[in-house]
């Protein structure tokens, strides 16, 4: 093909593509205008009733603001209430009891490494420095109960540092936050869908257009109401892992073939709206898949507790050739990508532990093993031979792999993959044995709105804070945190909004 004909071909292709695009253009939703009259006025509006939103509401109210929390779903809590109930707290009593040396510097470094250094170092530092005080806040102010004997190690962390709520669920925190809101007189309004965020002609966020009586997922349901915010709006609307079309826009491989750990309301409407009003967004294509998910369960389930707290910490993960293929305590992206690679070869990933690992999990979450084994979420075997046969794993290869793991347990040095071998890891020499398939599910949106350290949302055109708009939790990018991120920055966002001066 000559240069001229190639140029003509490309021009024709571009024109043709433009014609096709113009034929299917749908106008973007217009920005909502400031109403002539507001239906209701409060000081601070919080959007979302998970860890971050409720923490924000509590702090804003304590600072003297009149606060309302808006939740689009019929029940409060979002993903937080079905969360696994673990959070990181460097220097907590559980670490001290187990003789684990840790520091703020090490936690900050681990977060930066797990985030591939795409995180904002200043925000990471704030998170690390305030992790312990926020753990103490949940205990002393909210009355959250934790298992004081157990400590766990999350993937990507160089030492064990996460603690467990006593009930083994994020509800152990959310319920206490809801109780505190009620005590403080904060209304948590359910079925309240935020349709538009309203900026005035000076660029300030002054309120919201809301549909009360909303019936998910019917966008035109409910009655429209305009609520003004004298001081500020705090956005804590979470991620979009349950929104297949929106997540595929950012990561095309995440089709409807992938399940999600999230509740159905984890959708992208407010992600689109914040684009529409000019909020800067970062790293939205960084969508985390939970590598420890059990395909036998819908949603988050409980199978992940075995895969992580028993097999990854005290056992091993192998493919169906009987070979280890990843550091079981690497960060979630590394492990998920490794499983995807095995699955692409027609293999499956199997998490294995013996009774010792199961006992460790049981100590952290009393009663959990019965809940796992009786419905066959996790399978139990008297012999290694029976396990290998059930998963079609070559027995000799599995025994060889176990011998390597047992050598690492003795030397405290995992030469093949560099897994952290804690002092309580023991060689796996006796049964009974437990095993389960693990396959990633869409779990967490690492990107989101760009904010400053004080949680003010930044404008995409000016890079400056949008007056009256704050955000925390999963809808914020550049931190790569988790539960503790929601608590630390949720509280800060509520305080920032309550103290905002017009």
Outline where the language-model segments fall.
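Glycine-rich loop(s) and the adjacent beta-strand/alpha-helix scaffold that form part
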Residues: 215-297, 492
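Conserved N-terminal/central alpha/beta ligand/cofactor-binding core
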Residues: 12-14, 72-187, 191-193, 204, ...
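N-terminal secretory signal peptides and thylakoid transit peptides that target proteins
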Residues: 1-17
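Short beta-strand "acidic-cap" motif of Rossmann-like dinucleotide-binding folds
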Residues: 66-71
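Beta1/beta-strand and adjacent pyrophosphate-binding region of the FAD-binding site
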Residues: 38-50
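A glycine-rich dinucleotide-binding beta-alpha-beta segment and adjacent secondary-structure elements
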Residues: 397-477
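An anion/pyrophosphate-binding glycine-rich loop and adjacent beta-alpha core
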Residues: 271-273, 280-393
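A conserved FAD-binding loop/helix module that cradles the flavin
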Residues: 255-262, 269, 476-500
